[in-house]
């Protein structure tokens, strides 16, 4: 599918230090809490919670952390009240940046995100300023070593997938957001191994970034945003030459 962001590839290549792993666990737990608060603590009847739990398990989040996050969301134990916030802005080179955040203090997070944009050569925009550049989609990732691509392709398309693509050792399936749960059930029923599934944003088009200094500035901005405690996901609509991407590995 055209318009896939290179940022997803870059951050996947970076790997996890202990500090980053701790932050990832915290962010995954926060998503579980929000999902439980909005849709209840039973994953059988809460698809967002079901996906959040599966993704947390895939990343190695301990079961007790998952249980505690659910209980915080349902109010069974005390915890912060988090809400979803979507931030939009432009980075160096005119690259559109979309940020999903989960915060217990919207004013604090907004001020901090605005400061990061300004500090690293971008600017935070108003609601709707860049979201039109992205499409909301369902995304399922399967293990390419444990699944036959042709089989995944066949089952996914029959179940309504829009796109199936081999990406290194993984197989990526893209669908409409409302088709995600149904598609995942079809893949599960077919005995295919799913690594993760989520609602994501894909850019409709991409901006080519070829200047080294512009790319470095853009990377610094995206990296610092990704590292922010309240930020869950960062999306950007850029393409860059392989030699620039390799500098981030």
Curated annotation (Swiss-Prot):
Signal peptide: none annotated. It comes from the Bacteria. Keywords: Cytoplasm, DNA-binding, Transcription, Transcription regulation. InterPro entries: Integrase-like_N (IPR017856), TACO1_YebC-like_2nd/3rd_dom (IPR048300), TACO1_YebC_N (IPR049083), Transcrip_reg_TACO1-like (IPR002876), Transcrip_reg_TACO1-like_dom3 (IPR026564), YebC-like (IPR029072). GO terms for molecular function: DNA binding. Gene3D superfamilies: 1.10.10.200, 3.30.70.980. GO terms for biological process: regulation of DNA-templated transcription. GO terms for cellular component: cytosol. It is found in: Cytoplasm. HAMAP family: Transcrip_reg_TACO1. Belongs to the TACO1 family. This is Probable transcriptional regulatory protein Minf_0651. It comes from Methylacidiphilum infernorum (isolate V4).
